[in-house]
């Protein structure tokens, strides 16, 4: 049957949704997300009690948002994603760079779409939040609201936190190793396991 369910957020903020899709309401998007979350939890409980109970959407739920059609910063976008991961237990947030195809006073001008590199940086930052234990507010903040397009977010974070380096590889805990550019999840596990 269904492996994953997705309710698209469409735009990062309620203001953006109100501006570009006034017939859609944030509550009408978040309510089905909550229902899916509750179904997943109930399914987990049933599997714990009844070994052969069917698993409700085993791959979890996801959502998608268009970035660049409204003026939200990368920080705002990542904070929304963090909130969705924390409060709705989403497995994945997809980001889609806005591509202008129609002229409208509410939309960015034609041929001024969102750079695909921005979308790529959002995906990289999302990966850091899901697998490297970063929080949105560690990567960006209101004073520094957008990613450096020229650097991947983990390297950019390291340059902003030079006081945490160098790291003694033989003594650093797993969490610290995850923050070292060039060390991934598997390498951090191997380093900790080899001690």
Residue ranges and their predicted role:
Residues 108-179, 188:
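Long, highly charged, low-complexity intrinsically disordered interaction regions
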Residues 1-139:
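Conserved AdoMet/S-adenosylmethionine-binding subsite of the radical SAM
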Residues 194-195:
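Residue-level signature of tetratricopeptide-repeat
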